[in-house]
Amino acid sequence: NSSSLARDNYREFLDLVSGDPVLRAEAMRRLGDLELEATEAAQLGENIDALATDSYDSAVGLYQQLLEAYPDYRRNDTVLYQLARAYEIGGLTDDALTTLDELVARFPDTPFIDEVQFRRGEMLFLRKRYNDAELAYVAVIDFGDESKFYEQSLYKLGWSRFKLAWHEDSLEPFFDLLDRKIGDFDLKEGEARLAGLSRAEQELVEDTFRFLSISFSYMGGAEGIDRFLATRGNPVYSYIIYRNLGDLYLSKERFVDAAETYEAFVKHDPLHPKAPLLQVEVIEAYEQGGFPTLVLDGKKAFVERYGMDGEFWVRNPVDENQAVAAHLKANLSDLAEYYHAKAQTGGDRQDYREAAGWYRKFLAYFPDEPDSANTNFLLAEILFESEDFFAATDEYERTAYAYPMHEKSAEAGYAALLAYQEHEQTLQGAEKTAWHQQYLDSGLRFADTYPEHPESGAVLTTVAEELFADNQFDLAIAVGQAVVGKQPPVEPTLMRTAWTVIAHSQFDLANFVEAEQAYYSLQNYTPPDDPEARTEIRERIASSIYKQGEAARAAGDLETAVGHFTRLGTVVPD
């Protein structure tokens, strides 16, 4: 093949230039390179005996002879480099390291000094000679970031210093590496930008973060991070460092340490877009550890820091932080439900106030959410249970009438009436009168809005009675008519009450014709076994007919008057 032919040609050429040291040295180097390439090609072809071939021995021998015979050859740095490679290929790593050491000592300015130092660093690191490895990696970094070994050397420099227990000194190269790889990340790009790195770059970044977690765990945990960042500044990825350390503690079931680490970042940079999500991690760590009181405190801290009226939302638009808003809702609901249940169990007034406060915050922050109506109902319930009937009335009515129809709408409207009645018992005089009128208005609104509610007829009937008692006869009649006109019909006892209101109101308004007809209807709903009531109705009918006769006589219509008086004896013979 062409490689074999080229090697044969160089061997012949060596014989021809035996008297010319320059050409002979160049030919020896080139032949050595070809022999080494042939060895590598055989290895790639999975020839396990490749190192036992003449090519390998020839390459090593040529490089050694060249270095010995021509110590001043201008490319001896390359020869040493190739000889070190040959030793490494042959598994003679001690010889390879010795050769690289010689190269560094003799040719410190060789163009590939960065690669040489990196390879030395790798060999020294494997031999646990961390001091020497550290110096080798520093040399690569001093070469400059144009070296393709620069980033890997930053990584291994950090590890070398860590192995030497130089924990704080080990951090700088790791942070320098992260600054290069993700220091310009826009948080909005987040994971998508990280996913855009090559597989090798992703692994390098992930390994670096893992190391930092281990290193900071040796440096006092979150306090160590705080101290370091106080001198270096706060990189865009700092939240990942706190989060990863917290995750490390969590994996070891060090729940309090995990929570305190997450919270350290929140305290360090509370307005950072990721801070609320780490506050969530605080809560979850305490939950996993079984610390209910600390869970409660964590939820309160979340709401206090990230309520919708806080500075966080000035800097971080809601539409870009929907997850934070969702956690805020969940924590508000959890706090309200916790204190509501606690109040119902223990009856402590402070727990009632606490529950109401969290419900009110939820409604203030999320007034138009689908579950806001139900939350408003729960607020009204806690107020009623705590006997704050005045406030309960307002919240029940808001629940019933201020939202689109929902499953608690009608129940809230009816509950408002109960709250009205309870609060009225605490009032007197004009204040009580005004409140009672509001109660009647609310009753009418309830019956009109929720005619299908099982209590709608009873509410209307009660309102009709109350209006009659207040001498509001026209309105009492209208409400009574609404009761008797309901479909399906209300129960007979309510019909009886409604017709009583209608008939008496018409009579008191001197509408005796209408009163008479209403009393006939009332008679239909008065049971036969209530003779006293039936007697009263007959007397009312008689009075209505008599009053019609009197009215006709006063108007000069004697014929009509006589008809009424005559009819009186027929309709009410006794």
Specify the residue positions occupied by each region the protein language model found.
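Acidic, polar-rich low-complexity tracts and alpha-helical solenoid repeat scaffolds
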Residues: N1-D574
